[in-house]
From Swiss-Prot:
Lineage, opening ranks: Eukaryota, Viridiplantae, Streptophyta, Embryophyta, Tracheophyta
Statement: the UniProt record of this protein carries the keyword rRNA processing: no
Residues annotated as catalytic: D136, D289
Name of the coding gene: CSLA2
Entry protein name: Glucomannan 4-beta-mannosyltransferase 2
Task performed by this protein: Possesses glucomannan synthase and mannan synthase activities in vitro. Mannan synthase consists of a 4-beta-mannosyltransferase activity on mannan using GDP-mannose. The beta-1,4-mannan product is the backbone for galactomannan synthesis by galactomannan galactosyltransferase. Galactomannan is a noncellulosic polysaccharides of plant cell wall.
Primary site of residence: Golgi
Record-level Gene Ontology MF annotations: glucomannan 4-beta-mannosyltransferase activity; mannan synthase activity
Binding site for substrate: D195, D197
Family designation: Belongs to the glycosyltransferase 2 family. Plant cellulose synthase-like A subfamily.
Catalytic activity: GDP-mannose + (glucomannan)n = GDP + (glucomannan)n+1
Length: 534
């Protein structure tokens, strides 16, 4: 050992150990890959392809139906009896039914004036209209502001009631349920619900109530949402594309074929008798609106969607608010499916094909499969096949089917078709949270009943005056508050897969993977939407 310095021996020793460990890991990988990894990953590919075909068939079916509806279907006022309500000097207002307008609120500092003002401006006899502001706010300042606004309208002769509760049991469902128990509501035949940021036009009731008056089998009339801030940022444009497809296609198809669709929670008119017959509002899930709609439908009630009747509203413009909203909208339906699937199967009032539509199309494919296949296939399985080239993915499954589905989804918002590519990448990012939420709902895990009110900033054109107190900060200075570790983790995973495919692959998936990596990375850093510090 004379003349040999330890500093030259130790690095070689570590190098040898490192090479030995790497060699052992490589050997274990080769031993496990063929008998275990390859079959499991190939099975995952087949399952994802099956889900893709299911989603494609659903989209094609709805595409065909919506074309037939637009070309040959009669308009709602031709399919159902509709007679406008005319003012009569002799009868006065007695030919108008008594209507209740409910406006649930929770700390709506920026938008509370919008819905209250719009509701008070509805063209309806004042003695036949009751406006009920259900304020669950926990901020005393906001509560005082809302109460003062109600008093201001009451001084003008509007029949407006300001209601508060001692607790927030049941959240929105609890507030709506409590509101219907008030003594002054017993004379009301119909109830209209508007969230705090919704602004109905003055003729809203005159265009919708006659359908309920002259068609006793209709329980719900749903209006379409229109968005005052869709051009605020890229996040709101992406939301507009998804929601426009929902209203233009999904709601229209459900209304035209089975007289069933999910109540959207706002901008809808219910027959109070139908609510009571269905068991009233329930707070067992975070989608009390869908829960009531399914229960009412199982009792034979019909629903009508009016695409021409539009109500202005606001989209969440912060990524944090949007994520909470999507968690609720994804977790709630999955949880409701778990609770009601057997009740739907056993129901004897609803025909067989309507049961199939509700269970398979409405719940299983749209609320569960659509999220799972988007995330599992395009964000997990497809990248993993790059690391295991023995697993093959047919081009019709990886390219053709998603392309067709994307094109069919684009019909709702033609003006944003140039953003279609960005929308795909963004939807893949959001599928991570939606998949997680559906699993939480199906297994009724910890956050299954988490209710976070979607924060609105009053950022639409008609609400600019309400945003003076909002400070928007440059994005780069607030990174610690905006980091989303889940997205950043998937960005790293997809980047590794993309680099491996760039060096060793033959399918050129790295182009998609690098673009998807950027989308996850941007979302992970919170560089999307507007930013308002908490």
């Amino acid at each position: 050992m004379d003349g040999v310095s330890p500093k030259f021996v130790l690095p070689e020793t570590f190098d040898g150990v490192r090479m030995e460990i790497t060699g052992q890991l490589g050997m274990i990988w080769e031993l496990v890959k063929a008998p275990v990894i390859v079959p499991l990953l190939q099975l995952a590919v087949y399952i994802c392809l099956l889900m893709s075909v299911m989603l494609l068939c659903e989209r094609v079916y709805m595409g065909i139906v919506i074309v037939l509806v637009k070309l040959f279907w009669k308009k709602p006022d031709k399919r159902y009896k509709f007679e406008p309500i005319h003012d009569d000097e002799e009868l006065g207002s007695s030919n108008f039914p008594v209507v209740l307008v409910q406006i649930p609120m929770f700390n709506e500092r920026e938008v509370y004036k919008l819905s209250i003002g719009a509701a008070c401006g509805l063209s309806w006899p004042s003695d036949r209209l009751v406006i009920q502001v259900l304020d669950d706010s926990t901020d005393p300042t906001v509560k005082q502001m809302v109460e003062v606004e109600c008093q201001r309208w009451a001084s003008k002769g509007i029949n407006i009631r300001y209601q508060i509760r001692e607790n927030r049991v049941g959240y929105k469902a609890g507030a709506l349920k409590e509101g219907l128990k008030r003594s002054y509501v017993k004379h009301c035949e119909y109830v209209v619900i508007f969230d705090a940021d919704f602004q109905p036009e003055p003729d809203f009731l005159r265009r919708s109530i006659p359908f309920l008056m002259h068609n006793p089998n209709i329980a719900l009339v749903q209006a379409r949402w229109r968005f005052v801030n869709s051009d605020e940022c890229l996040l709101t444009r992406m939301q507009e594309m998804s929601l426009d497809y929902h209203f233009t296609v999904e709601q229209e198809v459900g209304s035209s074929t089975h007289a069933f669709f999910g109540f959207n929670g706002t901008a809808g008119i219910w027959r109070i008798a139908a609510i009571n017959e269905a068991g009233g509002w329930k707070d067992r899930t975070t989608v009390e609106d869908m829960d009531l709609a399914v229960r009412a439908s199982l009792r034979g009630w019909k629903f009508l969607y009016l695409g021409d009747l539009q109500v202005k509203s606001e989209l969440p413009s912060t990524f944090r608010a949007f994520r909470f909203q999507q968690h609720r909208w994804s977790c709630g339906p999955a949880n409701l499916f778990r609770k009601m699937v057997m009740e739907i199967v056993r129901n004897k009032k609803v025909r067989f094909w309507k049961k199939v539509y509700v269970i398979y199309s409405f719940f299983f494919v749209r609320k569960i499969i659509a999220h799972w296949v988007t995330f599992c296939f395009y964000c997990v399985v497809l990248p993993l096949t790059i690391l295991v080239p023995e697993v093959k993915v047919p081009i019709w499954g990886s390219v053709y089917i998603p392309s067709i589905i994307t094109i069919l989804n684009s019909v709702g918002t033609p003006r944003s078709i140039h953003l279609l590519f960005y929308w795909i990448l963004f939807e893949n990012v959001m599928s991570l949270h939606r998949t997680k939420a559906t699993l939480i709902g199906l297994f009724e895990a910890g956050r299954a009943n988490e209710w976070v009110v979607t924060a609105k900033l009053g950022s639409g054109q008609s609400a600019k005056g309400n945003t003076k107190g909002i400070k928007r900060f440059p994005r780069i200075f607030k990174l610690p508050d905006r980091l989303n570790t889940l997205e950043l983790g998937f960005a790293a995973f997809l980047f590794v897969c993309g680099c491996y495919d760039f060096v060793h692959g033959k399918n050129n998936y790295f182009i998609y993977l690098f673009l998807q990596t950027m989308s996850f990375f941007i979302s992970g850093l919170g560089w999307i939407g507007t930013y308002v510090p908490s």
